[in-house]
Amino acid sequence: MKKNIIVGQSGGPTAVINASLYGVIKAGLERPEEIGSVYGMVNGIEGFMQDRYMNLSAKLNEEELEILKQTPAAYLGSCRYKLPEDLSDPFYPVIFQKLEQLQIGYFFYIGGNDSMDTVSKLSRYAAANGSEIRFIGIPKTIDNDLIHTDHTPGYGSAAKYVAATVREIALDASVYQQKAVTIVELMGRHAGWLTAASVLARKEVGDNPLLVYLPEADFDLEQFALDVKAALDQQPNVVVCVSEGISDKDGTFICEYGSAAQTDSFGHKMLTGSGKVLEAFIRNRYGVKVRSVELNVSQRCSGMVVSMTDIEEAAEAGRAGVAAALKGSTGQMIAFRRKDGETYELECVTEDVNLICNQEKKFPTEWITKNGTDIGPEFWDYALPLIRGEAKRKMKDGLPVYLYRK
Amino acid sequence: MKKNIIVGQSGGPTAVINASLYGVIKAGLERPEEIGSVYGMVNGIEGFMQDRYMNLSAKLNEEELEILKQTPAAYLGSCRYKLPEDLSDPFYPVIFQKLEQLQIGYFFYIGGNDSMDTVSKLSRYAAANGSEIRFIGIPKTIDNDLIHTDHTPGYGSAAKYVAATVREIALDASVYQQKAVTIVELMGRHAGWLTAASVLARKEVGDNPLLVYLPEADFDLEQFALDVKAALDQQPNVVVCVSEGISDKDGTFICEYGSAAQTDSFGHKMLTGSGKVLEAFIRNRYGVKVRSVELNVSQRCSGMVVSMTDIEEAAEAGRAGVAAALKGSTGQMIAFRRKDGETYELECVTEDVNLICNQEKKFPTEWITKNGTDIGPEFWDYALPLIRGEAKRKMKDGLPVYLYRK
């Protein structure tokens, strides 16, 4: 008997989270004998609990789907909503009743660690309560911090944005003769994957960024001052890339030296300003011209600088999710496995979502070199294939055309 | 008798200042009967006084010239160097001797207000001292604040970057249900042209950015609070675009409420942080989620989001400069005149550089609407043609290929 699909997006936006949505919708449309409609939760599980959803398969035509595939941010809207730990909480019978009413057979949630926690809880409740609804997680995060997957959709485009933008900032910083330090602050609370991507900006060895600091290595202000001085002796224009989440050996975030930290609904520290703190520190210490640049949200939502490899892989993750669910999988996350061999090849597999949720994949400390100021060659081999390929963007009047939820 | 060309770049980088350099070099190469070599000053007039220059026509091949045309920032390097006001200063005989030694007949300086001041002084010294060297200014600034020209090369690409990026930031800001304010701070010390470009981000009337504040209108914190509240009553996600240079009715820069201001060598106030000041103000006032985003240097140095119209016009300005100089012009700046008629057409003319230097073209106050919070339709007609057209970028391994001075 035919069942319906429901799909939601959760957590922070990325450049390709809609490509995964595209993949789920396309795969659903291609299986009319098993799939009725493809519904979308508006604002994730939080919106769905308020009965906010839409029929995507009925609403979107072929052309709109192609635009959706290249639209950044989350078309369905997102949420940061943590499900109750206690599976006997009244929340669960309510949501399962809503799912049954819509004759949902397959539930897909596109997101990161916290979203996989949602998939884990719903699939465990289903198993314990005899529901046949299958729950699959589709990975998504620019932070690239999900375990049991080679990388995550969203990282390749964010890494490409960071590398291209830092290359341009280094060019900009090089136009004057006067000694100057430019500090670029990059996203990544606890994992340095995105900050590491800044080294791809180098066109050759010895290029800026000369110094790169990840959260995985303890940050020491005095050592930093020495590092910057040595770099300035090497060349007049020094570009430094730091993660928003760098902290000292006592675990105090550098940004806390300058600004009070707030906390989001998952208890994450909301970080800003490590770049500003270091800017003031170096200016006061050496009296040189110092500028700090926070790349901010464009890292995750730029649709102008995206990796076509990332878009295609994100779409494939969505398709693979539907295929896995129809084969009977539940409580699984779609993961990427890199095939051995010279050329880059990827396959989609499924991994137990319960082993993935609420875990963080750190940047390998053995890839961090030069006393915590640089990244080793292993990272180039890992990351370069992920940023390749240019999207053929639809433009109108000189601006990108995106799909908006009406 | 054959003479040589020397060309320099001065002031802040733009996405197309190298396209103007390309235009000068190409035009020089096309007139072998009149032009010997095309020299480039390294780091502008400051570097040239240190005998730092290069032979561009001998050094760059056809392929390198095409890459140069699409390379952001300043290939030759730049400077901020103010020539002595007193034309009897020993500086002048020294530099003219250097120019004569190189058999320079034609001097081109690509830059903004301050660079035109350099062209003015050198051309006046030449006239007063019987030198036949001809001095021509090629306009360049993302600020679009040069008078006697329809617009300036560099503005179109910066405006396109701002419009595209604000459109994406608005998309990113719209994914959550919770009320939130995003404040985007844009470049423009005293002229609001670039901040005005943020309204082009709207796909339809009533879209974000809902509020736009330019330096040309007095900024009032209490009125701002009321504007934001009214906007939040309209929709949950409000994007506000402000110029770095907004100031209150007493002329105090809003950023000064929060941070100390520094001064550059031209006496300009170096502004940062109006966005941060307003972020804290609104958060404290209303307790809503507020984020501020400073677009920073990518506005002027992004090569990934550029206007092909801007690139071609910048190259044409360089060519027109050479043509004007060979016809006998000196002490002139190349200016753009928009032809009347339905379709956008531009012609290059020459204007007296002495009337242009050290002047600022403000954004027309009659184009500022809704009590200083929006921009009128005249601006769309003015700006849309300037951001059209996509550059075919040369990419390698997923990253842009640029030309670097060796």
Language-model features and meaning:
Chain A
Residues 1-53:
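N-terminal phosphate-binding or glycine-rich loops at protein starts, especially the Walker A/P-loop
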Residues 4-8, 68-81, 140-150, 177-180, ...:
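Gly-rich Lys/Arg/Thr-decorated short loops/hinges at beta-loop-alpha junctions or inter-strand turns
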Residues 10-12, 41-46, 80-81, 112-113, ...:
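Short, ordered loop/turn segments at secondary-structure junctions
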Residues 14-24, 48-49, 84, 92-93, ...:
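Short glycine/serine/threonine-rich phosphate/pyrophosphate-binding segments
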Residues 51-105, 114, 153-155, 167:
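Glycine-rich oxoanion-binding loops at beta->alpha junctions
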Residues 98, 106-111, 117-129, 136, ...:
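Accessory alpha-helical/coil subdomains and C-terminal extensions
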Residues 255-406:
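C-terminal non-catalytic interaction/assembly regions of soluble proteins
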